[in-house]
């Protein structure tokens, strides 16, 4: 399903946490400790749930339905490939489980580099290629409980794409199905699926940095 239509249908139920979003949160907690986040941008923020309790954080998303569902005043409707922000405005940029929806993410990476302050960081997560190989898909349940598959492009070269845009790789880490994911399975698709998927990587995360002399 086209991402615009998908997020319009997903908006009413987006507040219900999914396993990829949960693992994304675990990765963020593990990888962002000690990094500056005084001026934070969540690019592709959805309903803005992640930044709701972060003072001064800003979000941008292409879906007006998602933004309306969140009801925040520090979010903007817009495309992460052409953002209405000043160059060097943010010391931390998140783009979490978003870039896989783009056929070509290079324009987004270039924008991240532009609006990131020199020495600042970009945190990116995506659906893991191992999950795709195992038959998992990017899906959601609408209000009627119908499951929809969202447009997704498998990609293993995020580090190369970010480098082309002027960012350098700092760290990468995988989020796998483990004990913390058990309840999602038990209350969802079942214990047998949990045992089948145990150890499977579902999310891959990257921390990039804009070099101090980038763009100078």
Residues covered by each model-derived region:
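Conserved class I S-adenosyl-L-methionine
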Residues: 1-35, 49-53, 66-69, 123-151, 176, ...
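C-terminal lobe and adjacent flexible extensions of AdoMet/dcAdoMet transferase-like proteins
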Residues: 190-195, 201-216
